[in-house]
C-alpha cells in the first residue's frame, strides 16, 4: 500500500450535529472533528480521536432482528457524517430503546451538548 492510500484509510473527518431536545426541536449544536491531524471544534478532540481509534465499528447500526429493551433514554438525537478511517459515514443516534442507548453511550463523547 502506498503512503497516500494509507493516509486515506486512516483519515477521520466528521461533522456532528446534536439535538438535545430531539431532531424536530431547536436549538441544535454542531461540531467538527478531524484526527489526521487532530483538529475541529469538538471539545477534547485528541481524547475523542484516541477513543475512536479503539472502537471497532462505532457507527454501525443496531443489527436487524435484535431484541431491545423498551427503555426510553431521552429525546436526544445526533447525526454523524463524514469519513471514519477513510470510509464514508452517515449514522443517526437516539436514545429511544436499550439498543440505541447502548450505541449512543459508546460514542457519547462525540455529543457534548446532549
Regions found by a protein language model. Give the residues of each.
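N- and C-terminal low-complexity/disordered segments
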Residues: 1-114
Amino acid at each position: 500500500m502506498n503512503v497516500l492510500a494509507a493516509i486515506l484509510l486512516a483519515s477521520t473527518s466528521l461533522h456532528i450535529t446534536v439535538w438535545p431536545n430531539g431532531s424536530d426541536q431547536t436549538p441544535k449544536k454542531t461540531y467538527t472533528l478531524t484526527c489526521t491531524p487532530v483538529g475541529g471544534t469538538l471539545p477534547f478532540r485528541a481524547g475523542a480521536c484516541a477513543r475512536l481509534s479503539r472502537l471497532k465499528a462505532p457507527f454501525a447500526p443496531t443489527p436487524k432482528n435484535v431484541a431491545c429493551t423498551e427503555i426510553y433514554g431521552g429525546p436526544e438525537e445526533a447525526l454523524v457524517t463524514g469519513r471514519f478511517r477513510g470510509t464514508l459515514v452517515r449514522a443517526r443516534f437516539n436514545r429511544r430503546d436499550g439498543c440505541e442507548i447502548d450505541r449512543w453511550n459508546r460514542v457519547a463523547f462525540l455529543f457534548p451538548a446532549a
